[in-house]
Design a protein with these regions (language model features):
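Strongly charged
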Residues: 2-11, 15, 23-27, 35-96
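Glycine-centered, phosphate/nucleic-acid-interacting loop/turn motifs that mediate DNA/RNA or nucleotide
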Residues: 32
Length: 96
C-alpha cells in the first residue's frame, strides 16, 4: 500500500524514453550530462521525486532541455505515456 515517493534517475529517464536502453541512461548520467535541481549528478541511482527539475542534453543539437518531473512510473509505456511523466519548462534555448 505504501508507494515509493521516489524513483532511480536512470530508471525514470528510461521510462520517460530519453534513451532506448537503461544502460544508455546510466552512461549519460555517469558522464555528468544530467542535472537534478541544478546540481550535476554522476550517480545513476540518484533518487528523484515529483517536482524535481532535470537538465538534460538536447538531441541532436547541444542545447539543454529543462523538464519538471510530474509523475513516477512503475513500468515503461508508450511514448504518449512517457510524455505524461514530465512537463517541459524550456527546450532548445541554448543556455548551458
Amino acid at each position: 500500500m505504501t508507494a515509493q515517493d521516489y524513483e532511480r534517475l536512470d530508471l525514470w529517464l528510461w521510462h520517460a524514453r530519453v534513451c532506448r536502453h537503461r544502460q544508455d541512461c546510466a552512461a549519460l548520467i555517469e558522464k555528468g550530462a544530467v542535472r537534478i535541481n541544478r546540481q550535476v549528478t554522476r550517480k545513476p541511482h540518484s533518487k528523484i521525486r515529483v517536482g524535481d527539475v532535470l537538465g538534460l542534453p538536447g538531441h541532436p543539437r547541444p542545447e539543454v532541455r529543462i523538464w519538471r518531473v510530474v509523475a513516477l512510473a512503475s513500468r515503461r509505456g508508450s511514448a504518449s505515456d512517457a510524455a505524461l511523466l514530465y512537463e517541459v519548462i524550456t527546450e532548445n534555448q541554448g543556455e548551458s
